[in-house]
Amino acid sequence: MNRQSWLLNLSLLKTHPAFRAVFLARFISIVSLGLLGVAVPVQIQMMTHSTWQVGLSVTLTGSAMFVGLMVGGVLADRYERKKVILLARGTCGIGFIGLCLNALLPEPSLLAIYLLGLWDGFFASLGVTALLAATPALVGRENLMQAGAITMLTVRLGSVISPMLGGVLLATGGVAWNYGLAAAGTFITLLPLLSLPALPPPPQPREHPLKSLLAAFRFLLSSPLIGGIALLGGLLTMASAVRVLYPALAINWHMSAAQIGLLYAAIPLGAAVGALTSGQLAHSVRPGLLMLVSTVGSFLAIGVFGLMPVWLLGVICLALFGWLSAISSLLQYTLLQTQTPEAMLGRINGLWTAQNVTGDAIGAALLGGLGAMMTPVASASVSGFGLVIVGLLLMLLLGELRRFRQPPPVPDGAPL
């Protein structure tokens, strides 16, 4: 492939065996978690007939993930990262086995589902931060943009396949099959991960875990560059919460059940296109400015989305949001990994991922509140245009990020 192509270069999977192992493990893991994501709400709904109970399980799991990201960040900067990844994956699989055994009981325990949800949410996120912190060592910092784009494609592809597979399993075998295959898939991921090289953390003084986490917070707040990236990431995740308005907007547009699915598919499709056409992003001399512009553009797409007279134009706006948000996210990921000191990669990655989780929850709550006071169309537009104003202000305030320059990559003669 031509080095100047806009298309994503997949050669990293050929030239870096360790990254190929991570790619395979991540894809299997995403499919496994997707099976779980379909089964848990369906089982709780069947047991309780309460959407509140379903929502409670999501909240508990999300809370455990937040804590896991914080703890995982500290562990990834303190202990051998490969061991943290393997421990987290294996422990997570044990929780899936517990869900499977519980589902096979004549009267499954609702409390067990909640407790195992806490268990799996914590340990799943524990491994995420260690894997993120280890990525620069696996591919080299010069290949982080390419690695991030390939990872994004993996996530999108797995997110499309797993719900469909999970639905088929539910219809044919029940939730126990979903849990059992999720457990099997999780343990299978250990095989490629065992081939990873040792990933020791950089040497640093021993300190209390809370003090270590506080040091990362201070670094995040004191660094205009890293702090600005994290802030943009949170706002972008808030904007993606517009999906809570899809059912109401579908009624306004008189959409059929099949057409509603296009709304949910539009953003992932746009993001996949963004990842596929990211071949030149690594050559950007001013990635900070490009990140700011793409983020504001994505907010504008959400603002215009709700104003569209027909649903097809709305789908196009969502796809545009997905494309622009993918560009911004890839730049965020790359700058965060390259500009963060090696000794803090675990904690900063944990904080960055945690604020994404928090941003989604805050965005959903705000849109839900707006929906109670105004029409769905107005809610989507107000949120989008409000974020545009915030984004424009940040373009003025985040001067260091806006002016940040990096030299273009030097060709290394690697096969393309």
Swiss-Prot record:
Pfam families: MFS_3 (PF05977)
CDD domains, sorted: MFS_MefA_like
InterPro entries the UniProt entry points to: Enterobactin_exp_EntS, MFS_dom, MFS_trans_sf, TM_effector
TM regions (residue ranges): 22-42, 56-76, 84-104, 110-130, 157-177, 179-199, 219-239, 257-277, 288-307, 314-336, 357-377, 379-399
Mode of membrane association: Multi-pass membrane protein
Compartment list: Cell inner membrane
Span of the signal peptide: none
Side of membrane Periplasmic, spans: 43-55, 105-109, 178, 240-256, 308-313, 378
Keywords assigned by UniProt, alphabetized: Cell inner membrane, Cell membrane, Membrane, Transmembrane, Transmembrane helix, Transport
Function noted in UniProt: Component of an export pathway for enterobactin.
Entry similarity comment: Belongs to the major facilitator superfamily. EntS (TC 2.A.1.38) family.
Protein name as catalogued: Enterobactin exporter EntS
Record organism: Citrobacter koseri (strain ATCC BAA-895 / CDC 4225-83 / SGSC4696)
Gene (UniProt): entS
